[in-house]
Amino acid sequence: MIGLVGKKVGMTRIFTEDGVSIPVTVIEIEANRVTQVKDLANDGYRAVQVTTGAKKANRVTKPEAGHFAKAGVEAGRTLREFRLSEGEEFTVGQSISVEIFADVKKVDVTGTSKGKGFAGTVKRWNFRTQDATHGNSLSHRVPGSIGQNQTPGKVFKGKKMAGQLGNERVTVQSLDVVRVDAERNLLLVKGAVPGATGSDLIVKPAVKA
């Protein structure tokens, strides 16, 4: 089953009949319009390409304009591709709504996490700070040793050090689907998802469900 492209609206909570509070993220999934269908003969694999939302006419490039015109759909803010499994068929110009998640229990949500800029090891990797006193005057939040000796004589790749934190692709798996509101194009999932309010999200049925 394919996924859909949505937009993070924010977080709220809903109550069960027993009065239990469930934190939920509201994802707005407007109709995804099919712009291209790829097949084995021409592309070597089966996939469907979709767009959603709108884009100002003066922001659409000529190649994009031609691509959308060929598909006969309105220009959207993004293009995303989903692999097709056996038996799944879509046609160019078709609209796919949030209703495809009506019978789905869990989803995987992918987004771009909030960027935190250049961060030290304490914030980025949860390193312990060193002594505040007892003779320590300069090295309170420094990482400490980053290597060994003349052998190996280098810092190993992947060493946890200070650097860019956030602003990377993150997937949160197996979030419970709490509600599907087809009338308002909303999907409510339990818990938090990556990214800032208003950012694009990719929602797929959970691979581990």
Swiss-Prot record:
InterPro entries given in the database record: Ribosomal_uL3, Ribosomal_uL3_bac/org-type, Ribosomal_uL3_CS, Transl_B-barrel_sf
Pfam families: Ribosomal_L3
GO molecular function: rRNA binding; structural constituent of ribosome
Location of region: Disordered: 133-153
Keyword Membrane: no
Sections of the chain in a coiled coil: none
Subunit structure: Part of the 50S ribosomal subunit. Forms a cluster with proteins L14 and L19.
Role summary: One of the primary rRNA binding proteins, it binds directly near the 3'-end of the 23S rRNA, where it nucleates assembly of the 50S subunit.
HAMAP family in the cross-refs: Ribosomal_uL3_B
Protein's UniProt name: Large ribosomal subunit protein uL3
Naturally occurring in which organism (per UniProt): Pectobacterium carotovorum subsp. carotovorum (strain PC1)
Gene responsible for this protein: rplC
